[in-house]
Swiss-Prot record:
HAMAP family: Pyrrolid_peptidase. It is found in: Cytoplasm. It catalyses: Release of an N-terminal pyroglutamyl group from a polypeptide, the second amino acid generally not being Pro. SUPFAM superfamilies: Pyrrolidone carboxyl peptidase (pyroglutamate aminopeptidase). GO terms for biological process: proteolysis. InterPro entries: Peptidase_C15, Peptidase_C15-like, Peptidase_C15-like_sf, PGP-I_bact-type, PGPEP1_Cys_AS, PGPEP1_Glu_AS. The lineage of its organism: Archaea, Thermoproteota, Thermoprotei, Sulfolobales, Sulfolobaceae. It comes from Saccharolobus islandicus (strain Y.G.57.14 / Yellowstone #1) (Sulfolobus islandicus). The active site is at residues 79, 142, 164. Removes 5-oxoproline from various penultimate amino acid residues except L-proline. Belongs to the peptidase C15 family. This is Pyrrolidone-carboxylate peptidase. GO terms for molecular function: pyroglutamyl-peptidase activity. Homotetramer. The keyword Membrane does not apply.
């Protein structure tokens, strides 16, 4: 069994992406006897679905967790729901934009994660890691990835979800405007703790509605 951890490459003005750094840092580690496989996703609508579907089919992980950066957020924010919707004012790394199309024309309008995100938020805060629940993963690549992750995890009766993180401090310090941030070490600890918590409680979470 494995844990599949997706991060994203840099995009738009953000020349470093903490989700990539977290996935790389945790790649090859072991959490509760499960090996973590970190995979970096391109910020391209036309590529991420095939990559996510292929990796989940190949690895059949017990948990697939996506991570993305949410510039402007100050806390780690586990996401509750992914919506079947693509909209972007800015293009992806290939210049592609969408104006309200569905991710999956045959899919549900929204899919809830089967990760206990409410309890996860409490756990992170209790361990000194600022966290809050998010009810919107947006409409850009993170929401797109989350929708596919949850959809595919259902096929294997496994766990799937998504967590947004702030910008990391070392990069935020180089941006010429005020912006919330968090230390990379704290975010790595937060994601590791999240995976431990999810795996510990996995039996209660393997139900879908």
């Amino acid at each position: 069994m494995t844990v599949l951890l997706f991060g994203f490459e840099p995009f738009l003005e953000y020349k470093e992406n903490p989700s990539q750094l977290i996935a790389e840092a945790l790649n090859g580690s072991t959490i509760l006897k499960e090996e973590v496989k970190g995979v970096i996703l391109p910020v391209e609508y036309e590529k991420i679905e095939d990559l996510i579907v292929t990796k989940i089919r190949e690895m059949k992980p017990i948990l697939t967790l996506g991570i993305g950066v949410a510039p402007g957020r100050a806390k780690i924010t586990p996401e509750k729901i992914a919506i079947n919707y693509k909209y972007s004012r800015e293009g992806d790394n290939a210049g592609k934009k969408y104006k309200g199309e569905k991710i999956d024309p045959l899919g549900q309008d929204g899919i809830f994660t089967n990760i206990p995100v409410e309890d996860l938020v409490d756990l992170l805060n209790e361990n000194g890691i600022p966290a809050e629940l998010s009810l919107s993963a947006g409409s850009y690549l993170c929401n797109n990835a989350m929708y596919i992750i949850i959809r595919e995890a259902r096929k294997y009766n496994s766990l799937g979800g998504f967590i947004h993180v702030p910008l990391h401090e070392s990069y935020a310090a180089r941006i010429q405007r005020p912006i919330p941030s968090m230390s990379l070490d704290t975010m790595i600890r937060g994601i590791r703790l999240s995976m431990e918590f999810i795996l510990t409680n996995k039996k209660e979470n393997l139900t879908f509605s």
